[in-house]
């Protein structure tokens, strides 16, 4: 009887100790965030059967632009729509990312326009070797705060993005997706080490 009591007591003490470590870790994260700390770098690791790449997001402070850079391999040569989508991906792949990240409910457009989705980046161009070198500077992508893109998805599309300029029958879809076609590779955007 006494042995069972001591065993149970040791389990309770262990659980309390682990919970206290978790609480200290969480409070350190929150303290750093409230003291002006923020993630300065994020990463999306893109991988499918044929396409792979790593894209980094770097923002030095909340007021600075975000640089989006990296390389994607295995694309068909030419332009491809490149967007941040609303949700992180689930088991059913890129379709679970939902629509472009658009918290202000605007129509799709060119990244330099006032009317655009926050998730509208631009087209990326793959060379004849299927490699796209990405280097984008964005004033509307944030790594912290209520408009943070961390936890959302980065998606590469099969076709070029028409930047909301489609005409005729293509106009309605142009204002939603840029007629960029199917989603060929995607990744959740996660926090990366700053170094």
Swiss-Prot record:
Lineage of the species this protein comes from: Eukaryota, Metazoa, Ecdysozoa, Nematoda, Chromadorea
CDD domains: Cu-Zn_Superoxide_Dismutase
Cofactor: binding details: Binds 1 copper ion per subunit.
UniProt-annotated binding residues for Cu cation: 83, 85, 100, 157
Function: Destroys radicals which are normally produced within the cells and which are toxic to biological systems. May act in the parasite defense by neutralizing superoxide generated by activated leukocytes, thus acting as both an antioxidant and an anti-inflammatory factor.
Keywords, alphabetical: Antioxidant, Copper, Disulfide bond, Metal-binding, Oxidoreductase, Secreted, Signal, Zinc
Organism: Dirofilaria immitis (Canine heartworm)
Annotated signal sequence range: 1-38
GO cellular component, one term: extracellular region
Localization (cell): Secreted, Extracellular space
Entry-linked Pfam families: Sod_Cu
Domain of life of the source: Eukaryota
Cofactor(s) listed: Cu cation; Zn(2+)
A GO MF term: superoxide dismutase activity
Coiled-coil boundaries: none
Name of this chain's protein: Extracellular superoxide dismutase [Cu-Zn]
